[in-house]
Amino acid sequence: MPAVRIKICGITRVEDALAAAAAGADAIGLVFYAKSPRAVNIHRAREIVRALPPFVTSVGLFVNASRCELGEILDAVPLDLLQFHGDERAEDCEGHRRPYLKALRMKPGDDILARVADYPGAAGILLDTYVEGVPGGTGAAFDWSLVPAGLGKPLVLAGGLTANNVADAVARVQPYAVDVSGGVEASKGIKDAAKVRAFVDAVRSRGRDEA
């Protein structure tokens, strides 16, 4: 199995971004959703992205943002990848000069494969826990056995991941990448460097065990 990529989401401070990169994370996530306790403004986001070392991907997370709002942010912040967590249609996610991920919440009864097919231009699909009215960052895991085979796109696994369960999640789901936020925090929006290192080590050790 190829190395699983790791994204540390909900970064709000330069020092947390640098700690994530130093621990071996492949990407960091910046939340542009005002209702989130992990939201960042344009100035802070630009500061964080500019501080990143080479080969660490910067990801912007959006929830039903207008095209005007997206344009303003993308003109100011050199993001590499966009991640859409709301009710966006494919046409809302495209045309921003960046590849994108579409997050789908594992709502009971939903046909995930059919929903994936609605986003043919997506670079990947992120599967997250469904909690009514909450677009992400719930801190709760979902039943990984519900992940369907044959998504046809790189799968990013999110939802309630921690250093204690991520190796099991990787073994069972075999995702392209894992995405964590609350599972590596000291408090909302503030990362715990030791938890970040432990999370990355848990993912990497799983890969070493399989080598």
Curated annotation (Swiss-Prot):
Q: Which UniProt keywords apply?
A: Amino-acid biosynthesis, Aromatic amino acid biosynthesis, Isomerase, Tryptophan biosynthesis
Q: Pfam families annotated for this entry? A: PRAI (PF00697)
Name the top EC class. Answer: isomerase
Q: In which pathway does it act?
A: Amino-acid biosynthesis; L-tryptophan biosynthesis; L-tryptophan from chorismate: step 3/5
Source organism superkingdom: Bacteria
In alphabetical order, the GO MF annotations are: phosphoribosylanthranilate isomerase activity
Q: Which reaction does it catalyse?
A: N-(5-phospho-beta-D-ribosyl)anthranilate = 1-(2-carboxyphenylamino)-1-deoxy-D-ribulose 5-phosphate
Per the UniProt entry, the Enzyme Commission number(s) are 5.3.1.24
UniProt-listed GO biological process terms: L-tryptophan biosynthetic process
HAMAP family named among the record's database cross-references: PRAI (MF_00135)
**Entry similarity comment:** Belongs to the TrpF family.
What protein name does the entry list?
Answer: N-(5'-phosphoribosyl)anthranilate isomerase
Q: Which organism is it from?
A: Pseudomonas paraeruginosa (strain DSM 24068 / PA7)
Lineage, uppermost ranks: Bacteria, Pseudomonadati, Pseudomonadota, Gammaproteobacteria, Pseudomonadales
